[in-house]
A protein has these predicted regions:
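Hydrophobic cores of alpha-helical transmembrane segments in multi-pass inner/ER membrane proteins
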Residues: 2, 166-177, 233-248
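Glycan-association/targeting regions that enable binding to alpha-glucans and other polysaccharides
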Residues: 3-169, 175-176, 182-185, 254, ...
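Alpha-helical transmembrane segments of multipass membrane proteins
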Residues: 29, 203-207, 268-272
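Non-cytosolic membrane-interface motifs at loop->transmembrane helix junctions
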Residues: 157-163, 218-231
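Membrane-interfacial loop-to-transmembrane alpha-helix junctions, especially the N-terminal start
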Residues: 188-201, 253-261
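Small-polar-interrupted transmembrane alpha-helices in polytopic inner-membrane proteins
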Residues: 195-214
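Juxtamembrane "helix-exit" motif on the non-cytosolic side of transmembrane helices
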Residues: 209-220, 274-278
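Generic detector of multi-pass transmembrane helix bundles and their immediately adjacent loops
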Residues: 234-283
Length: 283
C-alpha cells in the first residue's frame, strides 16, 4: 500500500515537471521568435561600420520616428574637420533630393530632417529615404550605400501600447504551448485552442487595429483593403485558431489541427514586423 502511494506521488511530480517544461520551452521559443522579429524588422535601426579617411566610422540610423518631432541623425567620434550632410527625399516619389548640412560639434556630427519646407509631409505612414554623406579633401563616403527608409508614425498612448505588446506576446506564448500539447499523453486541446483564440482575438483583432489607428491613422490595412503584412499575418493566425478551436470539438484527431495552428502562428510571427507596410499617398 505504501509503495503504491509513493509511486502515485512520483507520477504526480513527474507530470508537474513535464507541464513546467512545456511552459519553459514555449516561453523560450516565443521569446526567441519575438527577438528575431524585432532584430530583423524594418523598424530596427540600420547600423554598421564604414572606413573613411583611414578611420572606422560607426553609424546607427533610425528607421522609425514619431510625427511629433523631426528625425535626428547623429554620428559620434568623427574627425572635427570632416563635413557631413543628410541627403533625403520622400520614399518612392520623383521629389528632388534635399541636402542638409550637419553640424560638427567637437567630433559629433548631427542634424535633423525634414526641413521646414517638407514638414507638411511629416505625417503618419509617410516614408523617407535618406543617408549620410561625409566629405573631406575631395573624398566622399555615402553611409550607407543604399538609402535607409524611415517611416513616421503617430504617438500611441503608452498604456495601450504596453497592453497590446503584453497580450500579443501572451497570444504567441499560449499558441506555442498549445502546439506542445500535441506531445502530452493527457492533452486538453479544447482548453488551449480556446485560450489561444481568445487572446489572439483581443491582441491582434481588437488592440492591434487600435494601435494602428493611433500610429498610422488607419484601423485596418490588410485584406481586403490593402497588403499590409502585419495585418494579414495576424488575420491568418486568427483564422488558423478559429479552425483549430472548431476542430478541437468536432475532429476525431484535434491534435494535428492545434499543432498546425501553432506552427502557422510561429512561422508568420517570425516574419519581420511591418514588412510591406503602407506609405502615405503622395498629394
Amino acid at each position: 500500500m505504501e509503495d503504491n502511494t509513493i509511486t502515485g506521488e512520483v507520477k504526480k511530480k513527474g507530470w508537474s515537471f513535464k507541464i513546467i517544461m512545456f511552459w519553459v520551452i514555449a516561453f523560450l521559443i516565443t521569446a526567441g521568435s519575438a527577438y528575431y522579429q524585432r532584430l530583423t524588422g524594418p523598424t530596427y535601426p540600420s547600423s554598421g561600420v564604414v572606413s573613411f579617411q583611414g578611420k572606422d566610422v560607426k553609424y546607427k540610423l533610425d528607421r522609425s520616428c514619431d510625427t511629433s518631432r523631426n528625425a535626428v541623425v547623429k554620428l559620434e567620434n568623427i574627425d572635427p574637420t570632416i563635413k557631413g550632410f543628410i541627403e533625403y527625399k520622400r520614399y518612392k516619389t520623383n521629389d528632388d533630393k534635399t541636402l542638409v548640412e550637419m553640424k560638427n560639434d567637437g567630433g559629433t556630427l548631427s542634424a535633423e530632417f525634414p526641413t521646414d519646407k517638407d514638414r507638411v509631409y511629416r505625417v503618419p505612414a509617410q516614408k523617407y529615404e535618406y543617408r549620410v554623406i561625409l566629405v573631406k579633401d575631395n573624398q566622399k563616403s555615402e553611409i550607407p550605400s543604399e538609402p535607409v527608409v524611415l517611416r513616421f508614425k503617430g504617438d500611441v498612448p503608452l498604456v495601450i501600447l504596453l497592453i497590446h505588446v503584453i497580450v500579443i506576446f501572451s497570444a504567441m506564448l499560449v499558441s506555442t504551448r498549445a502546439g506542445l500539447e500535441f506531445f502530452n499523453s493527457n492533452a486538453n486541446y479544447k482548453k488551449f485552442a480556446l485560450w489561444a483564440l481568445a487572446i489572439m482575438t483581443l491582441g491582434g483583432m481588437v488592440l492591434g487595429p487600435i494601435v494602428q489607428k493611433y500610429a498610422f491613422g488607419e484601423l485596418w490595412t490588410g485584406i481586403p483593403f490593402g497588403i499590409d503584412l502585419t495585418d494579414n499575418k495576424t488575420l491568418i493566425a486568427w483564422i488558423a485558431w478559429i479552425v483549430a478551436a472548431v476542430a478541437s470539438f468536432r475532429s476525431k484527431n484535434p491534435g494535428r489541427w492545434v499543432l498546425g495552428a501553432a506552427l502557422v502562428t510561429l512561422i508568420i510571427f517570425s516574419i519581420p514586423h511591418s514588412v510591406l507596410s503602407g506609405n502615405t499617398p503622395v498629394k
